[in-house]
């Protein structure tokens, strides 16, 4: 089998540390699979690994895109697949690390993407959303694709527009397209290792603490620097949890403590969604940690799932 290990799990579950140690043990390099760590200048708010945390292990797909750029899962796979192939071609282990389940599935399982021709359809739908709001578009989506209409969050403008665009361009709903692609064999055979906690509250406590540490590490200054560099508050990158809330706070003179509580709440909700997504993958070997994790035990257990040697 290919020497690929995917370390997955919700935010603040310890993925970075495990990925680095596995890369060291199996002569590997880390391929980040995070939809926000791909942006430059956002290391604090996205919890991108520091040089110290990397421990000399080569990391890929971190800080490769401008924060003003719209970055999609298709673009990620386009850039990450050659990196993965290069790592393997040199006889090394590729340790994929990240909590963005869609990105990991698309890269390793080979989910194909619905065609996206440049006909102006997306721009037309975006203009409609700006003029009349997203609600009419969501209502149209529910008529043609009830499954997607029920699944997508009412404020997820980008995915609602994308789902409508796919139907209007191809005549096939995005739900049907996704069902077909899931029937295809995996593109890569990987060992999947999932990290979480025995008690969900322990994970939530770690998330709350992480947000507080981000503030201490200079998250607000990081956001100010992004805004000063000309990045629009409406940019996709600035809609990330931990940025949107503080951008609103900084630009509107809001209360930092209230914004912090909101970031913590949304981060906990996001972790719950991450777990829901990942638990659909029956290939994942889950390691559930106690409140005070024993990393040595976690590492030993992870190694038992890896059938190849460095």
What are these regions (language model features)?
Residues 1-310:
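Phosphate/pyrophosphate-binding catalytic cores of soluble transferases and nucleic-acid-acting enzymes
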